[in-house]
């Protein structure tokens, strides 16, 4: 359902929130309809109505749980001077064999589909030319890729967390998110910041 809502053009936050709201409404409607047909004591009837009300939400939540960072936007403003390319809108700091870094390409692809003007680039820390080629194949043209050398200011800025996402506006590093805080609200911020 999130994919369908995303394809319609809703914000990432609404795409994540609406299915949960929808399941609650389904539960309320089902409980209202079924409550008329229950001929039991008031306590049993109330327990049954409560269970029917929360059941759709519970099932959807079991399949698609809400994680701690799903609705957060806890990016950190960048105050350090970094020696990174400034000609992109979104920089993704990654490690060559990090599974979360590789997974992040799906997120970047969704962001790029929402706003095709966004120029994203993967910077593979201490990677080889082969790592860069591997990422470039996976990225399939929606982001560029290159290797960079590790630096103390960079590691301090991203707090040693990979992947990390850096928003660049007007050649200025604005905000950094780690993988746990780069959620739908952050995605919306990135999409809306780039004209």
Question: Where in this protein do the model-derived segments appear?
Answer:
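Thiol-based oxidoreductase modules, predominantly thioredoxin-like and allied folds used
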Residues: 117-134, 140-152
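Short active-site neighborhood of thiol/selenol oxidoreductases, capturing the structured segment around
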Residues: 83-102, 108, 114-117
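Membrane-embedded alpha-helical segments of integral membrane proteins
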Residues: 1-36
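Structural motif
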Residues: 93-97, 125-128, 169, 178-180
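Alpha-helical transmembrane signal-anchor/signal-peptide segments
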Residues: 66-82
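Thiol/disulfide oxidoreductase modules built on the thioredoxin-like
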Residues: 150-194
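Internal/C-terminal transmembrane anchor helices
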Residues: 42-66
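Mature, folded catalytic cores of secreted/periplasmic enzymes
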Residues: 89, 108-118, 134-136, 160-162, ...
């Amino acid at each position: 359902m999130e994919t369908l809502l995303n394809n319609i053009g809703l914000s990432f936050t609404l795409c994540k929130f609406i299915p949960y709201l929808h399941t609650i409404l389904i539960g309320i409607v089902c409980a209202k309809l079924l409550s008329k047909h229950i001929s039991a004591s008031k306590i049993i009837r109330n327990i049954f109505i409560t269970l029917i009300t929360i059941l759709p939400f519970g099932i959807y939540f079991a399949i698609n749980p809400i994680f701690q960072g799903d609705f957060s936007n806890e990016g950190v403003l960048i105050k350090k001077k970094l020696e990174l390319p400034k000609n992109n809108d979104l920089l993704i700091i990654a490690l060559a064999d990090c599974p979360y870094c590789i997974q992040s390409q799906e997120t970047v692809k969704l962001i790029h589909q929402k706003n095709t003007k966004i120029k994203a680039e993967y910077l593979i820390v201490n990677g080889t030319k082969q790592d860069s080629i591997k990422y470039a194949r996976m990225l399939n043209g929606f982001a560029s890729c290159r290797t960079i050398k590790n630096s103390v200011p960079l590691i301090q800025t991203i707090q040693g967390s990979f992947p990390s996402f850096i928003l660049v506006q007007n050649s200025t590093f604005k905000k950094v998110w780690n993988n746990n805080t780069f959620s739908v609200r952050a995605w919306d911020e990135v999409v809306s910041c780039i004209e």
